[in-house]
A protein has these predicted regions:
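A short helix->loop->beta-strand "cap" motif at the edges of active sites that frequently abuts
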Residues: 52, 73, 129-133, 137, ...
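Short glycine-rich anion-binding loops that position phosphate/pyrophosphate groups of nucleotides
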Residues: 36, 61, 108-112, 168
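Active-site phosphate-binding strand-loop segment of PLP-dependent enzymes
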Residues: 83-144
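PLP-dependent aminotransferase-like
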Residues: 45-106
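PLP-dependent aminotransferase class I/II
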Residues: 159-206
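Glycine/small-residue-rich loop that forms an oxyanion/phosphate-binding "nest" at active or ligand-binding sites
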Residues: 31, 35-41, 136-145, 149-153
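N-terminal small-domain helix-loop-helix segment of the aminotransferase-like
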Residues: 1-35, 42
Length: 206
């Protein structure tokens, strides 16, 4: 109904039910955003600070870099390996240890290479430095069907955030609706920099 403000709880309940086959999600482990780009921007606004390190791969989704630049962060990248664009897991791990990045973005599957890391590989990277926040961008996850959501425990892996959206997988790019999944304390913190009604009722209903 467009005469009242949008209500997010029904959508959160749907998302919780959607993943019941793998594990139970709580409403407070889910954030709702006006598209995945808004989620990415909110994460940088919450956790990115001047001169801190932002680690990602090259090439990858282009919106990460301007968000990091707006926060004055220093970007470090690792290039994919060879003609098959293998993930540089050893170099990436070494740079986590050496630079202790504040934010780590992994597009999985990667845009534009299609490179995929397993859930365990991502969890292993997150365990290297517990004070580094790893953001897993899963916008294209439905094309390979291997989401980290199927196995993660946000109480244990509390330095991992997962971003998903309905733009690519459901053909709803024009409605702008994105989600973050993570430890409830992280989600609550990110919600403080977003408006209470950023996502419109049409997008929620869809």
């Amino acid at each position: 109904e467009i005469s009242i403000y949008p209500e997010y709880n029904l959508l959160k309940n749907f998302l919780c039910d959607k993943y019941l086959d793998s594990r139970k999600f709580d409403n407070d482990e889910i954030g709702i955003f006006n598209g995945a780009d808004a989620a990415i921007n909110a994460i940088f606004n919450c956790f990115g600070e001047k001169d801190q390190i932002f680690l990602t791969t090259n090439p990858t989704f282009g919106y990460y870099s301007p968000c990091s630049e707006m926060r004055g962060m220093k970007k470090i990248t690792c290039s994919y390996i060879g003609e098959n664009f293998l993930f540089p897991i050893e170099e990436f791990s070494e740079k986590i240890i050496k630079y202790n990045p504040k934010l780590i973005f992994i597009c999985n599957p990667n845009n534009p290479t299609g490179t995929v890391l397993s859930a365990q590989e991502i969890i292993n990277l997150a365990n290297i430095k517990n004070d580094s926040l790893i953001i897993v961008d899963e916008l294209y996850e439905k094309f390979n069907g291997d989401s980290l959501l199927e196995s993660i425990d946000f109480e244990k892996n509390n330095n991992i955030l997962i971003i998903q959206s309905l733009s690519k997988t459901a053909g709803l790019a024009g409605l702008r609706i994105g989600f973050t999944f993570g430890n409830k304390n992280l989600i609550n913190y990110i919600n403080k920099v977003t408006g209470p009604y950023d996502v419109n009722s049409f997008a929620i209903t869809a």
